């Protein structure tokens, strides 16, 4: 039985999330509200909302958890070529927090294979825009010839980044945004990006699963650290474009 949370009810222990033998593995709780205070509390505990229009707010903590370690990001030869072009050609820009609501709306409208509709509802956009205004949500945006052609958004507390969604209106535009984010996080020494759930696309870029217990332990430590700066641009990509580029090994378990 999934517990229903009233406005003042705390989240149950994450170990009570539904298991793999159920129809909704990782489902922890449901509620009627998506208040910013509830959303912040969720992220600090390694919990995230995911639901569709017409459903209550559903809160998840899957086991295992999909992550991307910046030091393990895979740059294919074709992506490296693209990143070099982005660095070389002035019509390409990567902007941070220039149009956060616009990126969210674009992610909501992006077609997803095997998915009808979107989980990025108006309520979700309002809640995450509130986090953006408080400095805890960010967008990384790929621009070409003055037009936004791709990007991603996510949540950040301390030295932890929680990826939410990405979109592309031009080839590799979302990968350019992700690579720029990864390069910045590597530069800052950040060890983990939360990717929530396993997809073949994320796996192709170096994403992998870890046990929920290890994920939550890392989150608790990382969110207690001072926040990292969020001013950067495409120049950080230079660290990813060399043939022998490498980052220090991470301490994240395999």
Swiss-Prot record:
EC number(s) on file: 2.3.2.6
Alphabetical GO biological process terms: protein catabolic process
Major site of localization recorded for this protein: cytoplasm
Keywords from the named record: Acyltransferase, Cytoplasm, Transferase
GO MF assignments: leucyl-tRNA--protein transferase activity
Origin superkingdom: Bacteria
Catalytic activity field: N-terminal L-lysyl-[protein] + L-leucyl-tRNA(Leu) = N-terminal L-leucyl-L-lysyl-[protein] + tRNA(Leu) + H(+); N-terminal L-arginyl-[protein] + L-leucyl-tRNA(Leu) = N-terminal L-leucyl-L-arginyl-[protein] + tRNA(Leu) + H(+); L-phenylalanyl-tRNA(Phe) + an N-terminal L-alpha-aminoacyl-[protein] = an N-terminal L-phenylalanyl-L-alpha-aminoacyl-[protein] + tRNA(Phe)
Pfam families, per the entry: Leu_Phe_trans (PF03588)
Signal peptide: none
One GO CC term, this protein: cytoplasm
InterPro entries hit by this protein: Acyl_CoA_acyltransferase (IPR016181), Leu/Phe-tRNA_Trfase (IPR004616), Leu/Phe-tRNA_Trfase_C (IPR042203), Leu/Phe-tRNA_Trfase_N (IPR042221)
Subcellular location: Cytoplasm
The keyword Acyltransferase belongs to this UniProt entry's keyword annotation: yes
Family, per entry: Belongs to the L/F-transferase family.
Function: Functions in the N-end rule pathway of protein degradation where it conjugates Leu, Phe and, less efficiently, Met from aminoacyl-tRNAs to the N-termini of proteins containing an N-terminal arginine or lysine.
Listed HAMAP family: Leu_Phe_trans
Protein name: Leucyl/phenylalanyl-tRNA--protein transferase
